[in-house]
């Protein structure tokens, strides 16, 4: 027997001893005493003895994670050794090489990459300034996908709209040959719901303005901070329609623009922006698995996206998710646990530019999506998890989620009643294919202070919060994978 095999066997024996102790504690605590005698086979239940063992294993995974996981080390490595990882760039390719290497070091086998093509946008330079009435520079950043100005830039009068709805309603003559500025009132929320409401200001606004004859488009950054650090993010030009340069102002600079316009004397701004588009570039998803011993064709998917924007180092979005999910899977592997089903870790490529990796994954795996049991993604920074929800469609699935919630309660995580499909942005293509999802809701009250800015760096993350996330992911992933419970109704 080689040294590593002997070490794993020794770990396995220690783990089984620990499982027995934890199982006794769980029984005394009443966590496993309320198991129903049986659940219908149609719902895919497992027997109570197996469930008790799974719960004991999950409790140990939870406790090991909160005592210190690899999550912070992983995200620190990614953001230091690779840095920003713009979709389709050489840096994103280096990130894939990094991911394969780290997965191998963690013995997360087998490992593969699944490639796809995309058009790769690049930022080169950006500048904005007030020409009149009060000359001064403005802090701006180009939206992802924006076209350039001419080499000489463009100068125009700014017209203000307080909302996207106001721009939609404006007559063409109010917009034509002007630089459009759209404001908004994004609110700080725990669940980030305000982002979804105001996101169309960024994604749809440029084309609405262009169709009305605007020269360029400015918006207040979709963020909740008060720093002169503008927030980038993708726009979506309408196909076969005019395209105009589009930039985000930092929130303090947006305040400045609104103050100047409030005086009623007009505002003239000059913009200079250089970007480029590589028509055909490469990206890929990076995948690692722990193969199931009883039903390896059944898959529990967890993951995060590997790409990032180019302003910061992509620590919060989504290096944290990469670290959390990799560390959770590594914890299961290190424990010597082999689930009934396959656990598949997917690090999606090119999420920031339209969920391209997630769409490619759906298309490349159409033939097996019926066997995707459930999925969950970490893509909301490194804040502590505070709520668990799942869109289970079966009684047995609901019961297993309730057991997950019992084990997560000591982490400060409460069960939620919302069954809205979701689980994370990269899971939406799978949701459309009928795959159930589970969501570990993170506290996002400060997430949009940093999101898509130069301030998205690893010093903003807290190791203890990441460990709590790892604990939660390890628990739910293990329990879903080491079960034959169905979360979706039989066809």
Annotated model-derived regions:
Residues 47, 53-60, 76, 80-179, ...:
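Noncatalytic luminal/extracellular "stalk/propeptide" segments of secretory-pathway proteins
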Residues 49, 53-89, 229-234, 307, ...:
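N-terminal capping segment at the start of a domain
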Residues 135-137, 244-247, 254-255, 295, ...:
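Metal-dependent peptidase/peptidase-like ectodomains
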Residues 89, 139-245, 313, 415:
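Extracellular/luminal Protease-associated
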Residues 58-65, 80-91, 156-161, 190-206, ...:
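Second-shell loop/turn segments in exported
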Residues 73, 330-356:
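Short helix-loop-beta-strand segments that form the rim/entrance of peptidase-like active sites
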Residues 330, 448-491:
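His/Asp/Glu-rich mid-to-C-terminal helical/loop segments that flank catalytic regions of hydrolases
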Residues 56-57, 132-172, 235-315, 327-330, ...:
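Soluble metallo-hydrolase cores and metallopeptidase-like ectodomains found primarily
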């Amino acid at each position: 027997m080689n040294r590593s095999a002997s070490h794993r066997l020794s770990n396995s024996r220690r783990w089984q001893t620990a499982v027995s102790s934890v199982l006794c504690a769980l029984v005394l605590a009443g966590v496993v005493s309320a198991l129903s005698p049986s659940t219908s086979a149609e719902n895919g239940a497992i027997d109570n003895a197996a469930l008790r063992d799974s719960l004991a294993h999950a409790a140990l995974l939870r406790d090991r994670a909160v005592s210190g996981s690899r999550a912070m080390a992983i995200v620190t490595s990614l953001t230091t050794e690779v840095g920003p990882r713009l979709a389709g760039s050489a840096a994103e390719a280096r990130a894939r090489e990094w991911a394969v290497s780290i997965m191998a070091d963690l013995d997360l086998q087998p490992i593969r990459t699944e490639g796809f093509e995309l058009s790769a946008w690049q930022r080169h330079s950006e500048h904005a300034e007030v020409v009149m009435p009060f000359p001064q520079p403005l802090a701006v950043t180009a939206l992802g996908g924006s076209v350039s100005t001419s080499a000489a830039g463009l100068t125009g009068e700014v017209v203000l709209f307080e909302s996207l709805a106001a721009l939609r309603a404006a007559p063409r003559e109010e917009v034509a040959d002007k630089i459009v500025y759209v404001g908004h009132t994004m609110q700080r929320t725990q669940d980030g719901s305000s982002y979804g409401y105001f996101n169309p200001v960024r994604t749809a606004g440029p084309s609405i303005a262009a169709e009305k004859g605007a020269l360029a488009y400015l918006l207040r950054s979709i963020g909740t901070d008060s720093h002169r650090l503008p927030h980038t993010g993708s726009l979506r030009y309408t196909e076969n329609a005019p395209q105009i340069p589009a930039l985000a102002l930092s929130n303090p600079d947006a305040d400045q623009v609104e103050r100047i316009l409030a005086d009623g004397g007009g505002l003239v701004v000059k913009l200079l922006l250089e970007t480029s588009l590589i028509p055909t570039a490469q990206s890929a998803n990076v995948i690692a698995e722990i193969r199931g011993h009883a039903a390896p064709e059944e898959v529990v998917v967890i993951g995060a996206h590997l790409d990032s924007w180019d302003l910061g180092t992509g620590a919060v979005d989504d290096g944290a998710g990469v670290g959390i999910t990799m560390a959770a899977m590594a914890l299961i592997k290190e424990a010597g646990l082999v689930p009934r089903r396959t656990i598949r870790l997917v690090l999606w490529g090119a999420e920031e530019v339209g969920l391209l990796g997630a769409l490619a994954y759906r298309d490349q795996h159409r033939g097996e999506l019926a066997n995707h049991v459930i999925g969950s993604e970490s893509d909301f920074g490194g804040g502590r998890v505070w709520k668990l929800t799942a869109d289970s469609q079966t009684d047995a699935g609901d019961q297993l989620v309730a057991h997950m919630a019992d084990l997560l309660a000591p982490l400060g995580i409460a069960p939620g009643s919302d069954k809205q499909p979701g689980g994370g942005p990269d899971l939406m293509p799978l949701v459309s294919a009928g795959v159930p999802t589970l969501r570990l809701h993170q506290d996002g009250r400060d997430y949009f202070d940093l999101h898509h800015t130069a301030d998205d760096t690893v010093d903003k993350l807290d190791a203890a919060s990441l460990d709590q996330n790892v604990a939660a992911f390890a628990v739910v992933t293990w329990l879903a994978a080491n079960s034959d419970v169905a979360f979706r109704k039989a066809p």
